[in-house]
Amino acid sequence: MAVKIKLARFGKIRNPQYRIAVADARNRRDGRAIEVIGRYHPKEEPSVIEIDSERAQYWLGVGAQPTEPVLQLLKITGDWQKFKGLPGAEGTLKVKEPKPSKLDLFNAALAEAEGGPSTEATTPKKKKAPAKKDAPAEAAEAPAEAEAAAESDAPAAE
């Protein structure tokens, strides 16, 4: 059975996305695949190329023939050079820089705005005003405490 490593297209119109598939050479482009070993998204910047290197090496080793576009992708990832024993097995794949997490962005914005994140609410809670009945009782207790303190000082002076 002639086996090819080829691109199986899926995705929207004008936004092609491909699976890198190992399939019988007689099957149609998007037909049944023996195994999917990677993916290729050419419209993203830089293009997303993910190939399972171990499986690609296996299929190349058992005689699967890559199509021309897949051969170029294998050269970019370095799998073709590794298979042939050529120098440059590290490949020339460009990788997108990871995006900072939303939590990191939030903490950076807080640090810039106020000096650091806080665990409290952003607006202070309103304190309840003491009830009017409690206010005179507290006022009455305060002079009583002062009188008691004065009485305790008086016997000590005698």
UniProtKB/Swiss-Prot annotation:
GO CC term, one of those recorded: small ribosomal subunit
Bias-annotated ranges (Low complexity): 137-158
Molecular-function annotations in GO: structural constituent of ribosome
GO biological-process terms attached to the record: translation
Pfam families (alphabetical): Ribosomal_S16 (PF00886)
Matching PROSITE patterns: RIBOSOMAL_S16 (PS00732)
InterPro entries named in the record: Ribosomal_bS16, Ribosomal_bS16_CS, Ribosomal_bS16_dom_sf
Record keywords, A-Z: Ribonucleoprotein, Ribosomal protein
Region listing for Disordered, in residue ranges: 112-158
HAMAP family: Ribosomal_bS16 (MF_00385)
Entry-linked PANTHER family: 30S RIBOSOMAL PROTEIN S16 (PTHR12919), SMALL RIBOSOMAL SUBUNIT PROTEIN BS16M (PTHR12919:SF20)
NCBIfam families tied to this protein: PRK14520.1, S16
Family, similarity comment: Belongs to the bacterial ribosomal protein bS16 family.
Protein known as: Small ribosomal subunit protein bS16
Native species: Mycolicibacterium vanbaalenii (strain DSM 7251 / JCM 13017 / BCRC 16820 / KCTC 9966 / NRRL B-24157 / PYR-1) (Mycobacterium vanbaalenii)
